[in-house]
Amino acid sequence: MEETTIGAVLFDGIEENPYLNELYDAILYNYGRQLFGLTNLPEKEISVPAALRFADILSKSVHTQNEETHKLWAQELVALLNALRPDDELIQYYLGSVLTRVSNFRGVSLKAADYVSADLLDRIFTQVSKEYLRIPEAENEYFFRAQKEIYEKFNEPYFSYSAPTSLGKSYI
């Protein structure tokens, strides 16, 4: 029997989960309906607690190939739900949790500044992550992890990288 981790079992193929995709499609539909003012179209029913649970799970992905995709999807789910229901306290809590878990501290400061995890270990991990990702000479600004990895290689004798615009290359 081949050894595996619980993370590999949990996250392998999650992006193909029919219920997750059904929820995602309904969220996108409702967001498009709201964005374009198509109130004549019926709103699709969404189980917000289920969508938030999926976002929470995806934000904790350790999948070897799809970790970044899962974490981006988690952020998208909570951002869209927040746009649909900006006054929902449960969505606000998950928004802060997901953004913190994926180390999107800029997003936390903009959209979930009041978020504080109920878990002590999460709060400690967040503080350590924030200190690690802090931009030198900028007290309340943080790199994304990929940006930090690039920044740390600037002093190497040979350095080259290629990345999509969404990485924020000009910011580095």
List PLM regions with ranges.
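N-terminal helicase ATP-binding lobe
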Residues: 1-172
